[in-house]
Amino acid sequence: MNFHGQGHGNRSRVIRCLVQAARDALEERANRNHGVKVGGVHNLKGAKTENRRGLIEQPDGVKDRDIHGEYTVGHDDPCRSVFDPASAAEENLKIAGSEGVLESECVRHTTSKLQCMSDPLSGLLAALDLTDTGARTSEDIFTGPSQWQPLGRVFGGQVLAQSITAAIRTVADDRFIHSTHGYFLRPGDSDKPITFSVDRIHDGRSFSTRRTQAYQNGLPILSLIASFQVDDEGLEHQVSMPLDIPDPESLPSAADTLAGIDHPVARNWATQRAFDMRHVTSPVYFSVEGAHVPHQALWFRAIGSMPDDPNLHRAALAYASDYSILEPILRAHGIAWGTPGLKAASLDHAMWWHRYSRVDEWLLYVQESPTAKGGRGLTLGQIFNRQGELVASVAQEGMVRVPSA
């Protein structure tokens, strides 16, 4: 569903209705599988529209994955046929109409209606609508759903944004996140919910610090520390936004680029992302065109209007920042996401919020990889709004392995 043709008020109402539908679907799953209920719609500070809440138990069992996030498909795994880079390289992609196919594949591979919602933005909002379990020991405990992914792995940006959201829910309203540093410890299973524990490490006069651990099956999949600060005055300067960048309206979207490719992962990139991503140079989905350089730029924004909660936009910015951050490493070596045998996974993620900006307005993401060595690569990113303000800075190291020739 695309909201760009609707007025702001109508889009907001549609989003709210879709989020409520998402929460209803999540509750239905909890009732069916675990006999408990999960709560109503929250903003990131926890104001809720209804009083039902509960804890989703973690189902047993995990797929065969190593600590760095590589995914090994078992013989009886229904996702085996979803994506195989080698088959893609062997021209197993067909040009055909594909409307509705991805959703049916999702329904076939998971019991979660929430994960198969036709509008990805409502799915993102529902994923960030964490349930406060009410448990108060030494930590605050929240739970949240996972969004369906064709490879069966939780998107790193999702668990990152959810962990940030959990931390936000435990600080005073006058304190805003300004930095976070997180480590991806294990891959998450996208067909299972996630539990988040928040340790209130420190509250000072100006700063607060929180540590969030994200768990599945009793094991941590992400460990994150976030810092918050009250609004303050001080020195100001910033780097300039690059010149001669074409406007996003003049660039093709992922949906345009991948239109007609009859392949689950291509359809997921084209239609199941909550953000419209538009590369300034050609994207690196299945091939690398142009110079093999360690840098790129792209525009992105949410596919529809989002609620006005600034904390929601900050968390969603972290979500989107993980989409393409490893691509400069690939581009430098002429490697595409569809390269046979490619194994790539995020190892850590650091982010600094400098100035507030909405994520349902166009943002420019400038990325550069200064080095790659030992099966790891580092990328640095800067996010600007259309007014040229530096909104955020990002750094991520990732594992990138390509079979030797």
Feature map (PLM): residue ranges:
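Terminal targeting signals and extreme-terminal segments of soluble enzymes
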Residues: K113-A405
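Cationic, low-complexity basic patches in intrinsically disordered or flexible, solvent-exposed regions
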Residues: P59, C106, L114-C116
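Flexible domain-boundary/linker segments
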Residues: R29, G39-H42, G46, D66-E70, ...
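Intrinsically disordered, low-complexity segments enriched in glycine and mixed charged residues
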Residues: M1-G61, R65-H75, R80-L93, G97-G100, ...
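Intrinsically disordered, low-complexity segments enriched in small/polar residues
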Residues: N2, G69, S104-V107, H181, ...
